[in-house]
């Protein structure tokens, strides 16, 4: 059925002369009362001529040019335009001149010519004269429930979509919510392959047209609003016209004529003279406040929406047309005076004055009513009052006196008034002609058995449509049944039906459907129950009844029932509780609830709970022992909200496979869960909310945000029938929060397979699966495995093939236990080295150092099956690389090394390891390990050799015990010299690039992929927590995790330093120091002798060993690890709450990469500022409005930063999107360059290099307030006050600088562990000279947090939009969910912009907000921005006053964040230690 059928392809162009009627169309031809198909036996042409003659008789001043033939010739066009069967009223205002259509219709004498002229005035050569740009729908296209299947197909036809699309949407019932959800491509992609893609049928066109339909209808809706306000005046003017016509015409003709007001506004069919036309238009001057004919047309049409009838009633039917319609039998309600007129019913197919007009101009029900019953409802009052006091007369209905008979607004039908004596026959004819087919007897009627109004005895509220054939009962939940009259001695039993789609007007159909409701032959008496019952008939023997206990207390106990699920009820004795607090505690104890975040509600069996009971009301009920109540109390656990049943999978009727774009099951594996994009995080608050409908809840209007994909692994042990949403997550988190603890698998003692004295070569035995469960454990001295270092062991290199290829190092000169490492390598590619170890252990003379007792044991030993890696590629898309899979870097090198060594038939090994008082991980002999060359006393690292071409990467270690290495260092940063000299070794660059690419693209898909297997319990606990940005301390301790592509032990030169001193050499060889590096491929590494002076210094440029006196002057060098550790110590020693970050504006920036040696220039200018900064990029920690955000280390100062980068392709000058992104980044830089405030994320510097724009930001640990809300739940009011005050201070500072943020939301507020809240993400901020002036700006930001003036782009806006957004944030913190959580994006946008309404406060949240908090929200949600307070004014609001005793670190939220940070750190350590086999 056409939505708004184009008049094209039929050789008839829609004529402007009948445009007033062409936009009114009837309803379903099989059921509508005002059907377009008349059952009259007379020819249609004759009927039209007769109608036209009657019109001429009533209007004698018609122009002579308007002939009967002309009207007859134009009628087919009218009929065609009327032959539409949609139930929608559509007005199209395209009229250009108010007189052009009248004059053109009567321009010539011949009909076709006038019709042609009329076409020309209809818009020239336009195919569709009804302009889509000015289309107005009487129903709301933004409401998914309004999109019925009929409207969907009509919309497709109107926009020329192919029939295959229409059939597919019909076949799979894609309407309502399912139709609107197709706006999102993820939902549309499921069906796209089944729909043919053409120029006129594509997703892009479908989305644009659907959005345009929604937008245009709201944009033009102001016309409907204006017409609604003028409805009363227009009706009065039409009444005056009728009164004039009544004086000149007979009562019979007037009763049969169509609405005079419509004739006055649509004079083109009868063609009156200009004088009459002016008179008619003058009577409707209330609609003509503008000179625009288009506005006149639309307003007239809307105000007279009900005045149009079906196409058969486009002209009046005179009384001289005789139709053979049988006389209607006399109803016993009628008086004798009414029989005479009803014996000869009028012949008009529709009567315009029977039914009451619906007063809502924009209601979809009014258009539906007009389609069913014609127009002019309630226009004429009956000539004399109805004698029945309780009858449904149109007068009573119009005055609103019979409210009990009003139907529900959702009902598809509207009741008519009881016909008067003049109208009964006419109404009977309507019903008869519509139901002539299959009617056995047209004379069958139903007798109403009471002289009063029929009483309704059904339990449900019903509304009765009283007609002469039957009583049609329509359920009306909003209305109550009328009282039963006391004088009524008989009643008609009514059976209410639900959702009756059509009126079956025949008595036969009523008999078949409701055999007990309609009886034309006899009356139905009121059932009288004469049977008498006695109480004794129901009494049982006394022994079956319960016996009351006899106790010491004579007073009776009073019990109520409490429940937490409305299923299981527990009795609670009110006598045992005296105070309200004890009552609550007893109730919570009975139900097993261990917190007080609950609300109390009244309930009963098979009932829904009532509203939350305030404390004062609950106190009153307790004192009154819950009298006049059900005695049942429902306690709603706010920490564990009711969970919805999981909806059935979305399937179509013909089982079309609906594949999800992102497979949720693929997230179950430990590897692929890391690769999931964090774009899902934005689903909660961002533009993809179009797809966030609950399919099964669309009827009730409940909609929640879609759960991000990475949450699906969180509750893998929950009931599979439950839906995964935020409440599931919060439920699990609440239990963990109540008892925060970390449970790790304990690890057995690290066993060292020590060699026998007589063995030549001993290979360490891998630790088994049961032994590899690592955790914190202190290694104690094992008496049976002690090594006697007084007896030298035999060298494993006595075999010829294992003979050393270079000179052995000198033996240690002192007796202190030192560990040195000797690695050997044959550089020929054929003779490769097989890694093997032989372990010796020093004799201990004292217990382990204290730091080892608290530090984790690094157990990185592995079996061949435990192919694990310390870092998972492609894990940079999450806030923290999670989970940090793997344990041994030896495994990570397996694939690359085997590629280069698989052709070698013989593997050779040469390695020597001396052990001191430290625990050392052993390496399995069949794997190759990297080549660290220098190991120091306290490090716990894997030590082995590998090929020269191998690429060095750090092992999975923690530096928790690293600080003692700097105890001997000077306090000055520049004083550290040779103690940090590292013998470096270059790696092969091409192989590095290839391996990096392989790691990034392989996704662990090869046979030796890096995987780690956790048991489900451990994995769930770890992944659930790893969602916040770690603190800088955690990053400093785990640099290799967050900077996986950096060489942390690469020496960085700081400049010329003094010659090496013995003291620095001692510190270099001190067991407290930890460092490792790599050497040149052509340079064999050489251990450092453990004495105070050594003989050689390595020169990495020429690869030769030079004596000390011939070496170049040594330079001060530090490793990145050293610099970071110094910064970590300085941070710990800092006592300032606000730690200052070094700003780098206007300073040269140098990025540290692994491809070249970087020299740190610490020279300062006259202002004491560094002239140059070196920085290093790490893992991705988030995505902002533009580009990605990475972790960043300021190598010059050691500070942790964040860098936002936008990469611009080389040839992107024509790409507007990229240009706008770069421009936004430049704007962000210029706007925020000079900002410095505690509650604003600092911007530290900017760099543009190699088409990459880098913006350096302050690093804020913790997480956003939005993510905390989603994981933790709603906040307490003192905490909300604490955060709101900080945000207000930041906003006041921004506004004082003339900056509008324009995208304030909880996700853009960062909260660290110290409770400091910072405003971030200024990607769309704007700098303005006058921030409080309503300047014309574009709509930016996220819809749900937008102020009304931002959505209404015609109205400018100011900095007050940030105040509105702040109110949304406060509401979000109170409610635990985003504002407008029950609406999707499009609906919320129109709700804000059109209705100018603030987001509603959820019912369960309202009791939790104090009166001061409500006042604060009301101030923020002031619709008029002029009256909305500024940030400084809100700082003086009582809500902004934070209690002095408030301590953020003592709140549960702070403990929650801290436990997450500890768990993150522990997770990093565990993954470095844990080796599990499959």
UniProtKB/Swiss-Prot annotation:
Source domain of life: Eukaryota
Catalytic activity: L-seryl-[protein] + ATP = O-phospho-L-seryl-[protein] + ADP + H(+); L-threonyl-[protein] + ATP = O-phospho-L-threonyl-[protein] + ADP + H(+)
A GO cellular component annotation in the UniProt record: cytoplasm
Outcome when changing residue 1146 to V: In BCK1-10; Dominant active
Localization in the cell: Cytoplasm
Domain spans labelled Protein kinase: 1175-1440
Keywords attached to this entry: ATP-binding, Cytoplasm, Kinase, Nucleotide-binding, Phosphoprotein, Serine/threonine-protein kinase, Transferase, Tyrosine-protein kinase
Composition skew (Acidic residues), residue ranges: 967-977
InterPro entries membership: Kinase-like_dom_sf, Prot_kinase_dom, Protein_kinase_ATP_BS, Ser/Thr_kinase_AS
Amino acid composition bias (Polar residues), ranges on this chain: 58-70, 99-110, 253-273, 281-297, 386-396, 407-420, 765-777, 813-827
Record-annotated active site: 1303
Residues carrying Phosphothreonine: 407
Cytoplasm among keywords: yes
Disulfide bridges in this chain: none
SMART domains, per the entry: S_TKc
Segments of skewed composition (Basic residues): 223-233
Binding site for ATP: 1181-1189, 1204
GO molecular function, one term: protein tyrosine kinase activity
Record family assignment: Belongs to the protein kinase superfamily. STE Ser/Thr protein kinase family. MAP kinase kinase kinase subfamily.
Name of the protein: Serine/threonine-protein kinase BCK1/SLK1/SSP31
Species this chain originates from: Saccharomyces cerevisiae (strain ATCC 204508 / S288c) (Baker's yeast)
Gene: BCK1
């Amino acid at each position: 059925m056409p939505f708004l059928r184009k008049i094209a392809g039929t050789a008839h162009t829609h004529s402007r002369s009948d445009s007033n009627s062409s936009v009114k169309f009837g309803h379903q031809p099989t059921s509508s009362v005002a059907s377009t198909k008349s059952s009259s036996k007379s020819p249609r042409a004759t009927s039209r001529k007769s109608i036209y003659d009657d019109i001429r008789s009533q209007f004698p001043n018609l122009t002579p040019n308007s002939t009967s033939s002309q009207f007859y010739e134009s009628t087919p066009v009218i009929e065609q335009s009327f032959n539409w069967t949609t139930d929608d009223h559509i007005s199209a205002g395209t009229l250009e001149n108010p007189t052009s259509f009248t004059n053109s219709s009567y321009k010539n004498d011949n009909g076709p010519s006038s019709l042609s002229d009329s076409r020309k005035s209809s818009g020239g050569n336009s195919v569709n004269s009804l302009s889509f740009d000015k289309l107005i729908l009487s129903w709301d296209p933004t409401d998914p429930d309004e999109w019925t299947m009929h409207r969907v197909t009509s919309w497709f036809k109107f926009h020329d979509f192919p029939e295959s699309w229409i059939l597919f949407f019909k076949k799979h019932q894609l309407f309502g919510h399912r139709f609107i959800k197709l706006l999102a491509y993820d939902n549309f992609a499921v069906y796209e392959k089944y729909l043919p893609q053409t120029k006129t049928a594509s997703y892009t066109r479908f989305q644009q047209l659907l959005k345009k339909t929604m937008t245009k209808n709201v944009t033009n809706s102001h016309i409907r609003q204006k017409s609604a306000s003028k409805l009363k005046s227009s009706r009065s003017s039409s009444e005056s016209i009728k009164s004039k016509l009544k004086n000149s015409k007979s009562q019979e003709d007037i009763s049969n004529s169509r609405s005079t007001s419509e004739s006055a506004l649509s004079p083109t069919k009868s063609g009156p003279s200009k004088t009459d036309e002016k008179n008619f238009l003058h009577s409707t001057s209330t609609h003509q406040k503008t000179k625009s004919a288009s506005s006149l047309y639309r307003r007239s049409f809307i105000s007279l929406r009900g005045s149009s009838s079906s196409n058969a009633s486009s002209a009046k039917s005179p009384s001289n047309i005789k139709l053979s319609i049988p006389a209607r039998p006399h109803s016993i309600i009628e008086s004798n005076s009414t029989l005479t007129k009803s014996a000869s019913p009028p012949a008009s197919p529709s009567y315009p004055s029977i039914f009451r007009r619906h007063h809502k101009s924009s209601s979809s029900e009014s258009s539906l009513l007009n389609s069913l019953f014609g127009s002019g409802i309630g226009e004429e009052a009956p000539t004399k009052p109805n004698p029945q006091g309780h009858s449904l007369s149109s007068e009573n209905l119009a005055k609103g006196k019979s409210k009990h008979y009003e139907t529900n607004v959702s009902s598809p039908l509207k009741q008519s008034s009881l016909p008067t004596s003049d109208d009964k026959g006419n109404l009977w004819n309507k019903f008869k002609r519509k139901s002539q087919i299959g009617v056995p007897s047209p004379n069958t009627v139903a007798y109403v058995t009471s002289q009063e109004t029929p009483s309704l005895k059904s339990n449900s509220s019903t509304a009765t449509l009283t007609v002469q054939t039957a009583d049609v009962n329509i359920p009306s939940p909003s209305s109550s049944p009328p009282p039963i009259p006391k004088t009524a001695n008989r009643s008609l039993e009514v059976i209410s039906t639900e959702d009756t789609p059509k009126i079956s007007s025949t008595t036969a159909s009523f008999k078949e459907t409701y055999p007990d409701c309609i009886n034309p032959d006899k009356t139905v008496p009121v059932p009288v129950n004469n049977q008498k019952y006695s109480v004794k008939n129901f009494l049982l023997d006394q022994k079956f009844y319960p016996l009351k206990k006899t106790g010491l207390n004579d007073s009776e106990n009073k019990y109520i029932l409490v429940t937490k699920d409305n299923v299981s009820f527990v009795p609670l004795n009110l006598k045992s509780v005296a105070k309200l607090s004890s009552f609550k505690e007893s109730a919570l104890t009975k139900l097993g609830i261990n917190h007080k975040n609950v609300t109390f509600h009244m309930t009963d069996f098979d009932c829904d709970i009532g509203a939350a009971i305030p404390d004062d009301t609950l106190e009153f009920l307790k004192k009154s022992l819950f009298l006049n109540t059900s005695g049942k109390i429902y306690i709603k656990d706010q920490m564990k909200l009711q969970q919805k049943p999981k909806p059935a999978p979305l399937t179509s009727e013909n089982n079309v496979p609906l594949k999800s774009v992102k497979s949720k099951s693929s997230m179950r594996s430990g590897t692929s869960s890391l690769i999931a994009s964090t774009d899902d995080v934005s689903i909660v608050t961002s533009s993809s909310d179009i797809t966030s409908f609950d399919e099964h809840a669309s009827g009730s209007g409940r909609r929640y945000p879609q759960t991000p994909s990475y949450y699906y692994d969180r509750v893998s042990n929950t009931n599979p029938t439950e839906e995964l949403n935020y409440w599931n997550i919060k439920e699990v988190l609440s239990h963990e929060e109540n008892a925060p603890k970390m449970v790790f698998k304990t690890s057995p003692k690290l066993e060292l397979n020590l060699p026998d004295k007589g063995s030549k070569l001993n290979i360490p035995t891998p630790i088994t699966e049961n032994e590899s469960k690592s955790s914190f454990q202190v290694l104690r001295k094992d008496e049976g495995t002690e090594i006697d270092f007084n007896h030298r062991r035999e060298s494993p290199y006595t075999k010829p093939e294992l003979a050393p290829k270079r000179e052995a190092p000198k033996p240690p000169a002192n007796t202190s236990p030192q560990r040195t490492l000797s690695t050997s390598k044959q550089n020929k590619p054929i003779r490769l080295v097989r890694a093997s170890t032989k372990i010796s252990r020093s004799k201990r003379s004292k217990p382990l150092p204290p730091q080892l007792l608290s530090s984790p044991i690094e157990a990185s030993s592995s079996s061949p099956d435990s192919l694990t890696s310390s870092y998972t590629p492609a894990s940079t898309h999450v806030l923290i690389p999670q989970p940090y899979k793997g344990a041994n870097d030896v495994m990570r090198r397996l694939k690359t090394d085997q590629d280069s060594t698989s052709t070698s038939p013989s593997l050779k090994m040469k390695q020597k390891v001396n052990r001191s008082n430290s625990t050392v991980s052993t390496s399995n002999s069949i794997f190759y390990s990297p080549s660290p060359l220098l190991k120091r006393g306290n490090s716990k690292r894997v030590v082995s050799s590998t090929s020269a071409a191998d690429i060095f990467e750090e092992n999975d270690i923690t530096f928790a015990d690293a600080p003692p290495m700097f105890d001997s260092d000077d306090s000055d940063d520049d004083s550290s010299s040779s103690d940090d000299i590292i013998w470096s070794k270059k790696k092969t660059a091409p192989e590095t690039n290839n391996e990096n690419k392989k790691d990034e693209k392989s996704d662990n898909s090869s046979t030796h992929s890096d995987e780690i297997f956790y048991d489900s319990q451990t994995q769930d606990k770890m992944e659930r927590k790893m969602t916040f940005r770690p603190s800088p301390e955690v990053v400093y301790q785990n640099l290799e995790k967050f900077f996986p592509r950096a060489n942390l032990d690469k020496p960085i030169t700081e400049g010329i330093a003094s010659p090496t001193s013995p003291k620095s050499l001692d510190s270099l060889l001190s067991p407290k120091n930890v460092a490792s590096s790599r050497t040149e491929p052509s340079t064999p590494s050489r251990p450092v002798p453990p004495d105070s002076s050594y003989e050689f210094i390595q020169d990495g440029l020429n690869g030769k060993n030079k004596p000390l006196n011939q070496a170049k002057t040594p330079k001060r060098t530090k490793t990145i690890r050293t610099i970071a550790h110094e910064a970590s110590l300085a941070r710990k020693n800092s006592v300032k709450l606000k730690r200052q970050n070094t700003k780098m504006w206007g300073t040269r920036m140098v990025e540290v990469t692994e491809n070249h040696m970087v020299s740190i220039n610490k020279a300062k200018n006259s202002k004491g500022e560094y002239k140059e900064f070196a920085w290093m990029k790490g893992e991705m920690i988030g995505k902002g409005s533009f580009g990605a955000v990475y972790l960043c280390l300021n190598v010059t100062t050691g500070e942790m930063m964040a860098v936002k980068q936008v990469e611009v392709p080389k040839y992107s000058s024509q790409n507007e999107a990229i240009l706008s992104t770069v421009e936004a980044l430049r704007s962000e830089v210029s706007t925020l360059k000079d900002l410095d405030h505690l509650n604003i994320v600092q911007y530290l510097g900017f760099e543009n290099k190699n088409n990459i724009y880098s913006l350096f930001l302050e690093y804020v640990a913790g997480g956003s307030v939005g993510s905390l809300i989603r994981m933790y739940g709603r906040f307490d009011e003192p905490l909300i006050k604490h955060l709101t005050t900080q945000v207000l201070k930041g906003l006041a500072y921004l506004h004082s600088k003339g900056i509008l943020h324009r995208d304030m939301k909880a996700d853009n507020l960062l909260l660290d562990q110290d409770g400091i809240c910072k405003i971030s993400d200024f990607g769309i901020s704007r700098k303005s000279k006058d921030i409080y002036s309503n300047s014309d700006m574009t709509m930016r930001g996220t819809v749900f947090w937008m102020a009304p003036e931002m959505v209404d782009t015609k109205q400018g806006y100011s900095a007050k939009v940030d105040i509105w957004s702040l109110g949304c944030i406060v509401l979000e913190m109170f409610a635990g969910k985003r504002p407008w959580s029950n609406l999707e994006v499009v609906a919320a946008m129109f709700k804000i912009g059109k209705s100018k309404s603030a987001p509603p406060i959820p019912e369960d949240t309202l009791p939790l907000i104090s009166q001061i908090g409500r006042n604060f929200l009301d101030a923020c949600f002031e619709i008029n921005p002029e009256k909305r307070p500024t940030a400084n004014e809100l700082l003086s609001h009582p809500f902004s006053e934070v209690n002095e005793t408030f301590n953020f670190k003592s709140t549960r939220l702070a403990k929650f964040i801290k436990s997450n940070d500890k768990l993150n750190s522990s997770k990093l350590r565990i993954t470095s230690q844990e080796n599990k086999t499959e």
